[in-house]
Amino acid sequence: MATTVSDESIDQLQNQVTESLGAFRSQREEIDRVAALKAAQRLVNALQKPQDSVYHLAYSPTHAMCVRIAIDMDIFATLTERNGPVSLDELAAVKKASPILVERVLRILVGIDYVGECDTRVYIATTMTRQLTDRLSISVIKFIFDVGMPTLAKVPEFLRGHDHRNPEGATTGPLQFAEKIDESIWTWLPQNPEKLDSCNTFMEGDRGARPSWLEWFPVEERLLCGANPDAETLMVDVAGGRGHDLAAFLARYPDVPGRLVLEDLPHVLEESTMDAERIEKQAFDLFKPQPIHGARIYYMKFILHDWSDEENHAILTQLAGAMEQGYSKLIIEEFVLADRDGAMLPAMWDWEMMIFCNSMERSKSHWTRLLEGAGFQVIKFWAPPGDGQGIIEAELK
């Protein structure tokens, strides 16, 4: 069976790849890298036979499965540490595993370039091998596979049972259906310490390799220039996890006056090792009144996408009560879904939010409705370079 595109179409796609690669090579901008990647993927899709494409999709879960097994077997760590050719028997010996099983895992890993093959049953580290020794990368694989995959497999059944309605409510979603629980993920996770640790570590690196908002958002112009140097608090990281984002802000602006406050649940704050001299820890519940009043910046990254519109209305209303009109800024770092030609990464995150939290990512119009309904006005949507999270700058009406 032939591909479904003509030679002329393939030539056009090849030209698009060449042009986008040229732009990336000359500018080295994130937006050009993403454009080149999309063009290359369109060419790959065009060359793929439709039936083969279906088979690749159907069998693709084996990729993540073998990566997850390889983490348990220390395959990535061993290849990286040896920094040279390693035989199949040597890799199997690390965990006293069956060489036949290890070879089956390695066939997939070599096929997706997560491991190199330099001779028959002899392997070597690649860039992706080394990446999978990074604690943040390991945690995202563990969390998505161990917590997300069992639920993902149940989503079609869950939706059939709910007449294919978009689910709502933090305790009545796919996770609750799959795990047979009646509590939110945030109540359930602390009962599973290993999964909770994977989640919290994953959240430290949830931007992936995409640039921090501090690198492209005009922080000094939009936030610091209007800050009152005599004000008690400069920035509150609302539900900020272990404090990695607040630490990045402090590293970039070490001399800014005012308190820097990290807020989260007590069991999360206990895991934080941030600079105790400048970063204060404040135990906090999103659904209770905001304890820090009149700060210049209230920063929320990947918080509101964890909750439904109804729950977010309650969260934002509590926050609004602590903000100073005309002075305080709400800075939301989240994906902003495009109305068309959207990037794949935010679309995949959107489904993960349903799987884990029974929530969603949002478009500009959706964000605007949500914020205005809680007493805010959107000042500006700031688009990121590439396909990462944007910044929503908002104030009280």
Would you name each region that the model predicts?
Residues 1-186, 226-232, 375, 385-387, ...:
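N-terminal accessory segments
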Residues 14-20, 24, 96, 105, ...:
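Conserved adenosyl
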